[in-house]
């Protein structure tokens, strides 16, 4: 296997592991509670610790397929047909696109529920416009409720849905709420129904971590959590001390894994740049200037090339 292919395989594996750890961290109830407090009207102003108990069960992380016909699964218990999220047969359904995180939240009235989906994006995709994908996801979360959350024509039982997209490495910090509105063209008839069923939150995280103030509170938390620049101690200090989030062992482990993997990804990328520049005839001094590596470090990377090929 040649060097470029080896590096590509290694990078893909590292990025996959990084993505898995990132989703597990985002899927922690304490983190999800902070997201809900800043994005869902009913929870705004609440203490995130009080919202944790509203999150029902364990959030499904990378298990529920997005594809029509596969989001739900039926089972039978005591002669009764039950329909829920499809979280089984991951091997059979390997390769399917899945929701990053999806879960139910019990509202403050203790009766109604909403469905929350959280998606993490390292940057804006090049092959399609991200808002179009978000619209598809939120539409699937609405349509898949049939037979799971309501039956036949009981459309009044449709649960409200939020699809929250956390987009990293943006030029600026931002947050937008995309939702349905009614525009009267002729007359002003009040059509019955709920315009608030479908909600998309686009949350942009700037490359630079914002200061801790009320406006950017959520951006700072998620920015620190997902940063590829901060050390483990810096991340845990912000998350634990500034946001009073309990740092349990599995949480600390995932933060550690993410930090190690992100450093590995950066190192692999730099090594690939160095090798490509060397092949194109750049001098060691020129490569050192561009990559901010010492000449001795560059020589070590270049010397490894024949052995890896």
Walk through the language-model features, giving the residues of each:
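Polybasic (Lys/Arg-rich)
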Residues: 201-209
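Short, charged alpha-helical interaction segments and adjacent helix-coil junctions
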Residues: 5-12, 16, 116-121, 211-309
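Generic structural signal for hydrophobic core residues of well-folded globular domains
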Residues: 39-40, 105, 167, 206, ...
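Accessory alpha/beta interaction modules
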Residues: 1-199, 211
């Amino acid at each position: 296997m040649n060097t470029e292919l080896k590096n590509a395989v290694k990078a893909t594996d590292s990025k996959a592991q990084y993505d898995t750890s990132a989703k597990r961290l985002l899927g922690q109830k304490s983190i999800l509670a902070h997201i809900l407090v800043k994005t869902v009207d009913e929870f705004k102003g609440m203490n995130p610790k009080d919202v944790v108990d509203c999150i029902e069960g364990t959030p499904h992380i990378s298990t529920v397929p997005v594809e029509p016909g596969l989001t739900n699964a039926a089972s039978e218990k005591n002669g009764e047909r039950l329909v829920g999220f499809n979280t089984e047969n991951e091997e059979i359904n390997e390769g399917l696109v899945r929701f990053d995180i999806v879960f139910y939240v019990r509202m403050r009235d203790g009766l109604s529920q909403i469905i929350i989906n959280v998606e993490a994006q390292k940057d804006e995709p090049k092959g399609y416009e991200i808002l179009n994908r978000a619209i598809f996801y939120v539409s699937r979360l609405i349509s898949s409720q049939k037979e799971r959350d309501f039956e036949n024509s009981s459309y009044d039982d449709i649960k409200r849905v939020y699809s929250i997209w956390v987009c990293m490495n943006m030029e600026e910090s931002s947050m937008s709420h995309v939702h349905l509105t009614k525009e009267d063209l002729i007359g002003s008839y009040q059509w019955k129904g709920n315009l608030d069923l479908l909600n998309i939150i686009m949350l942009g995280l700037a490359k630079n971590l914002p200061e801790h103030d009320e406006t950017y509170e959520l951006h700072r938390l998620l920015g620190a959590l997902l940063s590829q620049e901060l050390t483990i101690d810096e991340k845990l200090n912000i998350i634990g001390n500034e946001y009073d989030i309990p740092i349990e062992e599995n949480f600390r482990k995932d933060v550690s894994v993410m930090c190690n993997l992100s450093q590995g990804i950066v190192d692999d990328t730099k090594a690939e740049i160095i090798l490509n520049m060397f092949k194109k005839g750049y001098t060691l001094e020129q490569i050192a200037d561009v990559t901010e590596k010492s000449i001795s470090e560059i020589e070590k990377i270049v010397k490894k090339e024949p052995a890896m090929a």
